[in-house]
Amino acid sequence: MAQTGITAPKGFVASATTAGIKPSGKPDMALVVNQGPEYTAAAVFTRNRVIASPVKVSRENVADGQLKAVLYNAGNANACNGTQGDADARESVNTLATKLGLAPEDIGVCSTGLIGELLPMDKVTAGIEALTAEGALGDNGAAAAQAIMTTDTVDKETVVFADGWTVGAMGKGVGMMAPSLATMLVCLTTDASITPAMARIALAKATAVTFETLDIDGSTSTNDTVFLLASGASGVKPTQDELNDAVFAACSDLAEQMQADAEGVTKRVSVTVTGTTTDEMAINAARTIARDNLFKCAMFGSDPNWGRVLAAVGMADADMDPDHIAVYFNDQAVCLDSTGAPGAREVDLSGADIAVRVDLGAGGEGQATVRTTDLSYSYVEINSAYST
């Protein structure tokens, strides 16, 4: 039966297990294996300068554009653990390599969870044993997607069917969402026959306009990793544009799922900025609004408080005419020429989706959209209790 995630494309199998890393006792380790005949790989990692040990190892191993497997654990980030953390990440890869008969450099590794605690290597080793046991690997994409969850409330999968080839994906991440990815792990698989250069181009283009425009709370994780693995098992060689479109579609779907499942979310908010000189300025302005706590609180309260939008965007590094800014909530003008529009306070924001559009009045062609959420009581409750 066709799967909806990473095992939908030909040439991929997966497994999942409960190793006891999560205090909840829920599944917490997963394995994705590319059975070939090709082993093309590309990745995008966090831009946080404090990077977790698995990111260091994966960055080295994917540099040649080839990977045959990726190991995941949830419940422990293996970040900020010094040389011991690095050694544990490498030990995990070495142990898996022995079990699968692969070279260690053919394996990627990802961790997510609490920062600053050493990996329980006895549990990791036992988990690898279970992941590679006879009969464990198969069409288990859904189980793998569930095993990588942390504060997610639902697993996240998608599939894109192209002309004779497929892209599948799984992801996790609902908090610490900000540019340069998020607390986010994503694995995309495809049975298309592509080169490493094609994979890198498609992944960079897709993440730039999907995951990197998702900004939930302004925090950037130490562990962000997005992998694209290609088996070539379909025998189809798409063009670069065809690959770009399919990878974008998969990433966009996952990004929307992450926004919908964001920690404590009650409102899904899009912030679009126009009327400035460059796209870079527009995205800076949109992010400045999206990160502003007063704005986010107004969204939680369904309050069409356009003044908070102006106060926030005025801090952005973007060209603007401060006397001629326009703000629209759900396509209704609430502020024109930087003053309130008639009926602004009566705009209905009670729905779950809110579209905010801001014209900075500088007359340029720059534009960008950032997706965010409101700031609710539940968000504070979830994150104040996270380490416990």
Swiss-Prot record:
Q: List the disulfide bonds.
A: none
What biological-process terms (Gene Ontology) are attached? L-arginine biosynthetic process; ornithine biosynthetic process
This enzyme's EC code(s): 2.3.1.35, 2.3.1.1
Site feature (Involved in the stabilization of negative charge on the oxyanion by the formation of the oxyanion hole) residues = T112, G113
Per the record, the pathway is: Amino-acid biosynthesis; L-arginine biosynthesis; L-ornithine and N-acetyl-L-glutamate from L-glutamate and N(2)-acetyl-L-ornithine (cyclic): step 1/1; Amino-acid biosynthesis; L-arginine biosynthesis; N(2)-acetyl-L-ornithine from L-glutamate: step 1/4
**Does the record carry Nuclease as a key word?**
no
Q: Does the keyword Membrane apply?
A: no
Q: Which domain of life is it from?
A: Bacteria
Instruction: Tell me the compartments it is located in.
Output: Cytoplasm
Q: What class of enzyme is it?
A: transferase
| Sequence positions that bind substrate | T150, K172, T183, E263, N383, T388
**Location of the active site:** T183 (nucleophile)
Q: Which reaction does it catalyse?
A: N(2)-acetyl-L-ornithine + L-glutamate = N-acetyl-L-glutamate + L-ornithine; L-glutamate + acetyl-CoA = N-acetyl-L-glutamate + CoA + H(+)
Q: Which UniProt keywords apply?
A: Acyltransferase, Amino-acid biosynthesis, Arginine biosynthesis, Autocatalytic cleavage, Cytoplasm, Multifunctional enzyme, Transferase
- One Gene Ontology term of the molecular function aspect: L-glutamate N-acetyltransferase activity
Predominant cellular place of this UniProt entry's protein: cytoplasm
The UniProt site entry described as Cleavage is assigned to: A182, T183
The record's Gene Ontology cellular component field reads: cytoplasm
Quaternary structure annotation from Swiss-Prot or TrEMBL: Heterotetramer of two alpha and two beta chains.
Family (UniProt): Belongs to the ArgJ family.
User: What's this chain's function?
Assistant: Catalyzes two activities which are involved in the cyclic version of arginine biosynthesis: the synthesis of N-acetylglutamate from glutamate and acetyl-CoA as the acetyl donor, and of ornithine by transacetylation between N(2)-acetylornithine and glutamate.
Mind telling me what this protein is named?
Arginine biosynthesis bifunctional protein ArgJ
